[in-house]
């Protein structure tokens, strides 16, 4: 591993190592286990690849949101499953709409101009009406950390052509399919009180006994 030119990106859990030349791959594979072991880590090495659009880091892949501007975007399948689920207890319709507003604002900040994602978070904002997020909807220490790091902020905007093509290359959803999904989100409605759903009606046994709202 020593002497091999590379770029390393890590978050304490996942790590990506990028090499400038595929010919260096064999040298890297020969030394990576020992190199990490010297620092006290037993490292699991996954498959390598040369397709930049399939580079995966913390369940995100690179999307060219504007020509020359890249953004790591969450996997839509896992992201939407999580973004539809609330761990905040709702006692009223206002609680529900306040939660929708919080998710909308957070989603806009990280993916407002990303295909499919932007449309979902815009729909949440529309459904929230005039509700305002509650303090317990925010992870304040994380927000402060992001501010100190100077993390960028995105805004709702129509996805660019490059974003649609890049999103397709990363996740296999064609530009036409993206627009159809966005149309579905634009028609999304909610109701109160929530209805109980069982695992037989949704994808995921962990949802047994969870509650959802009409129309989602």
Predicted regions and their residues:
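Catalytic palm active-site di-aspartate
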Residues: 2-20, 59
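C-terminal, non-catalytic extensions of nucleic-acid polymerases
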Residues: 95-216
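Polymerase palm active-site segment centered on the conserved acidic dipeptide of motif C
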Residues: 21-81, 106, 116, 123
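Conserved NTP-donor binding/palm subdomain of two-metal-ion nucleotidyltransferases/polymerases, i.e.
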Residues: 69-109
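Secondary-structure transition/capping motifs at alpha-helix termini
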Residues: 1-2, 39
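Short, well-ordered coil/turn residues at beta-beta hairpins
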Residues: 18, 38-39, 61, 138-141, ...
């Amino acid at each position: 591993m020593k002497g091999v030119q590379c770029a390393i990106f890590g978050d304490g859990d996942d790590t990506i190592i990028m090499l400038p030349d595929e010919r260096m791959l064999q040298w890297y594979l020969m030394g990576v286990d020992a190199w990490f072991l010297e620092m006290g880590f037993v490292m699991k090495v996954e498959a390598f690849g040369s397709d930049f659009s399939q580079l995966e880091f913390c369940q995100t892949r690179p999307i060219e949101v504007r020509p020359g501007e890249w953004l790591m975007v969450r996997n839509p399948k896992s992201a939407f499953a999580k973004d539809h689920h609330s761990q905040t207890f709702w006692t009223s319709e206002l609680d529900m709409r306040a939660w929708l507003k919080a998710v909308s604002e957070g989603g806009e900040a990280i993916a407002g101009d990303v295909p499919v994602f932007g449309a979902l978070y815009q729909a949440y904002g529309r459904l929230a009406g005039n509700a305002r997020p509650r303090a317990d909807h925010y992870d304040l220490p994380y927000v402060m950390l992001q501010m100190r790091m100077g993390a960028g902020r995105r805004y709702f905007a129509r996805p660019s052509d490059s974003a649609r093509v890049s999103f397709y290359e990363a996740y296999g959803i064609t530009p036409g399919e993206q627009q159809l999904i966005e149309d579905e989100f634009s028609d999304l409605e909610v109701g109160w009180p929530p209805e109980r759903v069982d695992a037989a009606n949704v994808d995921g046994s962990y949802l047994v006994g969870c509650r959802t709202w009409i129309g989602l």
